[in-house]
C-alpha cells in the first residue's frame, strides 16, 4: 500500500510544490497526480499517475487514449476520467485559440500545423472540413464523420451543407490515417473527385484535401490528385 501524499513532507507533495514553485517545477506524473486529486486504497495519486503514464506510453499515449480505456482503467473511474479528459480538451482548445490568430490558410503546412493536435493522433479516422472566407481565413469548421471517407457514409452534401449555410468562399477537407501513413487510398481519391465536382456546381472552391499521418501529411492538391 502506497504512503498517502498528505503524509509526505510538504516539499514532496505535488499540489503544495505547484502552488509554491509553479507548475513548471513539476514533472508530468506530479502534474497528473494534482489533477487526479486522490489515489486508491492500494496506491497514492502519484503512484496512480505513474501507472497511467507507464501503461499508455507517456503523455503522448495518454492524449491518444480512447475515453473508454481511461474510464475502465483500474483506479480511475468516472470522476477522475472526466477531470483528465477535460484537462486534455482544454489543452487542445488552447492550441486552437492561439492558432486562430494566425490562421490564414495559405499553404498545406498551415492546415497540418492547425489540425495535427486535433485529429493527427486519433485512433479512428476523422473527417474535418475547414470553411474559409475570401482571404483564406477560418470562418468555421466541422467534424463531418468519424470512421473515414470510405466507410462512414460521407457525401459531398455533408461537406458543403454548412459551407452554404455560413456563406463560405472555400473549403479544405482533412482527415487522419491512424496507421501513420498518409498515402491516399483509392477511396480517398474517388471521394475527393466527387467533392470537386460538387464544388464546381455550387461555386464553392475546394482548396485541398489534406491527409495527416504520423508527423507527416500529404496534400492531394499538391500531388495533383484532383
Curated annotation (Swiss-Prot):
Gene Ontology biological process: proteolysis
Key word Protease present: yes
Keywords carried by this UniProt record: Hydrolase, Metal-binding, Metalloprotease, Protease, Zinc
Motif, JAMM motif: chain positions: 175-188
Chain segments annotated as transmembrane: none
One Pfam family here: RadC
Residues the entry annotates as binding Zn(2+): 175, 177, 188
Domain MPN residue range list: 104-226
Any GO MF annotation of the entry: metallopeptidase activity
Family, as annotated: Belongs to the UPF0758 family.
Protein's UniProt name: UPF0758 protein CHY_0341
Amino acid at each position: 500500500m502506497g504512503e498517502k501524499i498528505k503524509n509526505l513532507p510538504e516539499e514532496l507533495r505535488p499540489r503544495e510544490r505547484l502552488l509554491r514553485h509553479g507548475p513548471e517545477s513539476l514533472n508530468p506524473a506530479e502534474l497528473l497526480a494534482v489533477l487526479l486529486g486522490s489515489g486508491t486504497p492500494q496506491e497514492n495519486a502519484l503512484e496512480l499517475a505513474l501507472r497511467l503514464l507507464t501503461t499508455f506510453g507517456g503523455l503522448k499515449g495518454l492524449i491518444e487514449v480512447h475515453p473508454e480505456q481511461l474510464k475502465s482503467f483500474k483506479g480511475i473511474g468516472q470522476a477522475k476520467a472526466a477531470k483528465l479528459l477535460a484537462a486534455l480538451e482544454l489543452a487542445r482548445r488552447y492550441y486552437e485559440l492561439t492558432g486562430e490568430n494566425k490562421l490564414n490558410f495559405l499553404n498545406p503546412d498551415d492546415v497540418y500545423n492547425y489540425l495535427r493536435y486535433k485529429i493527427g493522433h486519433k485512433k479512428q479516422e476523422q473527417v474535418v472540413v475547414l470553411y474559409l472566407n475570401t482571404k483564406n481565413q477560418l470562418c468555421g469548421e466541422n467534424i463531418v464523420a468519424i470512421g473515414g471517407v470510405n466507410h462512414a457514409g460521407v457525401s459531398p452534401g455533408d461537406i458543403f451543407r454548412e459551407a452554404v449555410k455560413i456563406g463560405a468562399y472555400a473549403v479544405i477537407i482533412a482527415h487522419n490515417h491512424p496507421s501513420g501513413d498518409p498515402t491516399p487510398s483509392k477511396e480517398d481519391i474517388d471521394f475527393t473527385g466527387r467533392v470537386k465536382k460538387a464544388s464546381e456546381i455550387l461555386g464553392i472552391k475546394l482548396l485541398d484535401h489534406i491527409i495527416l499521418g504520423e508527423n507527416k501529411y500529404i496534400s492531394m492538391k499538391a500531388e495533383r490528385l484532383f
